[in-house]
Structures are given as C-alpha cells and as structure tokens.
Amino acid sequence: MPVRFDCFVTGTDTEIGKTLASAALLTALAGAGYRTAGLKPVAAGTLAGAPERTNEDIEQLRAAATVGLPMATLCPWLLDAPMSPHLAARRAGVTITLPPIVDALAQARTQADAVVVEGVGGFRVPLSDTFDTAQLAVALGLPVVLVVGLRLGCLNHAALTAEAIAARGLRLAGWIGNVVDATMAGLDDNVATLRRWIDAPHLGTIPRLPRPDARLAASHVDIAPLLAR
C-alpha cells in the first residue's frame, strides 16, 4: 500500500492553472498506485445548464480522481456568484466556516490514499471577514504545493507567496510552473530564477496547452520529490 500523501495546492494568483496542476498531481499519483481524491473546499461560480449544481474546477478534479465523492464532500462551500468567495457567500446569505471543510477532508481520507486539496485564488483570498485561504491551509496542516503562473510579474508573486507560506509555519513541498503566457520573454530564465529563489523542489513546468488535459500535464510533473518526504 502506498504511503499516505495529502497536499494543499495554492497559487500565485487566480486563473494561473491551479486546477490543471491539481488534476495533473491526481493523475500522477494514480499512476503511482494511489487511490486519489480531489477536494475544492470553496468554489465561486457555478456552471449554467449543468444537470447538477457544480463548478468547472470541481469537474476537472472529479475527472482526474480515482475515488468518487459526493458533491458535499468534493466542495463543502459551492457558491453561485463568480466573485471573491467572501462576497459570493455574503450574496448567498451564508458564512464560510472551517468545520465542514475539515469534515470533508476526513471523509475523503477514509476512501483515498492521496487527497489533493485545491485552494481558491491566491494564498490570501478572503473566505469571510475574518478568515482567509492562508488560515485554511494552516488549519488543515498539509504540505503545500505552489503553482506559479508563468507570466510577467511571476517572480515577485512567487517570492511573496513562498514567503507567506513559510511565515505561517507551513512546509512548501514543491512548486509547479504553469505557462500562462506562451510569448513571455525570458521564460526559461524566469524558471531558472524561480529555481534559485524558491526553497523547495521544482516539480516541473506545464507548457501552454490548447485545452486542459490532466494526463498531458502530468507528463510534465515529477511527484517523486513529494513522495520522498
């Protein structure tokens, strides 16, 4: 039986490929013999016309996982409005709290050897007036995988995010580059700089893909450093 592995995936910003990277991790872990589950504890913006109330990120994680989970476990806080979660929750008349998320992770861990928990937006997105994604990561206590959206400005964003993770006593287990801007000048030089600056293994760089493809993305990700710790 594989040694248990769970992680919290965060990113340098929103729309930088966290879901694709999370799905790639799930695919790679399944290839290593793990029973996998993906959680999106908080999601804002539901799919119009879907047969059930869901979200695009949730569906990508569900497709990449090998363990099927009910929606209430996959995403304890699914909000309709595509905006910052604390604002979407306010519009829905609810307050995002930690206990349902902790319960969802516990339930997922009873069925899967590896759970990938994808955060929402960047590392310090407000979930309520007093609670943000950084506090969620601390409460869950999982090793963190940072997804760096490779575009102009990523060096500053990555350095600040890695610093914020370390300041909270969390272990940065690795980072994944995801090419957001295929025309970015000095792409390879930026990746080399990130490798020097970020005190964690570089798990790989996902190129700009024509469409999200977890299996193809996984071919660019090396999970060995994650499983060796």
UniProtKB/Swiss-Prot annotation:
One of its GO terms (cellular component) is cytosol. The lineage of its organism: Bacteria, Pseudomonadati, Pseudomonadota, Betaproteobacteria, Burkholderiales. This is ATP-dependent dethiobiotin synthetase BioD. Pathway: Cofactor biosynthesis; biotin biosynthesis; biotin from 7,8-diaminononanoate: step 1/2. It catalyses: (7R,8S)-7,8-diammoniononanoate + CO2 + ATP = (4R,5S)-dethiobiotin + ADP + phosphate + 3 H(+). It is found in: Cytoplasm. The gene is bioD. The keyword Phosphoprotein does not apply. It comes from the Bacteria. Belongs to the dethiobiotin synthetase family. Keywords: ATP-binding, Biotin biosynthesis, Cytoplasm, Ligase, Magnesium, Metal-binding, Nucleotide-binding.
